[in-house]
Design a protein with these regions (language model features):
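Extracellular jelly-roll beta-sandwich "head" domains, especially the C-terminal globular C1q domain
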Residues: 1-157
């Protein structure tokens, strides 16, 4: 298992930037790739790389953060696998005013093939569908992330 955190307010560079976690507060021994483990990750790098290591692996990922923005509007966060947004991980909130805070969270079960390697990044999503007219996208605001936690744990099934 690994758990990474962000404590201080961290503005992202754009509305499509990855979230860079600056501190790992829990990391079990099997979550080190140098020990034949299943995860390659370093603090300050947005990419979490999971290795299949010869057997099918199932992983639970959980993300939670307080989000804000310098402007009112929609902020959206999602999980990307090998550069592709996983649709059911997108979470969007509407901030009524600049510097308002809302909580965004998701959990997802992932499968990595036995000989596969997958890279995961949590990032801001640049646009989301308008609820009443889904074909018309809403451009999102640049998020400010604080009190964020992201963890990945390997499961047995």
């Amino acid at each position: 298992m690994i758990q990474t955190i962000i404590n201080e307010p961290t503005p992202l560079v754009s509305n499509s930037s990855p979230i860079v976690f600056d501190n790992t507060d829990i990391r079990t021994r099997c979550a080190f790739c140098s020990n034949g483990g299943w995860l390659d990750y370093q603090d300050g790098n947005p990419i979490f790389k999971i290795f299949g290591n010869g057997y099918t692996g199932y992983y639970n990922v959980n993300f939670s953060a307080s989000v804000s923005s310098a402007m009112a509007g929609v902020v959206a966060i999602g999980l990307y696998e090998d550069g592709i947004l996983i649709p059911d991980t997108v979470r969007a909130v509407t901030l009524a005013a600049a510097d308002d805070y809302e909580t965004i969270s998701f959990n997802k079960k992932l499968r990595v093939c036995p000989r596969g390697t997958s890279s995961y990044v949590i990032a801001s999503v640049p646009s989301v569908p308008t609820p009443t007219t889904p074909t018309t996208p809403i451009t999102t605001q640049i998020p400010i992330i604080t009190n964020a936690t992201f963890n990945i744990s390997r499961t047995n099934n």
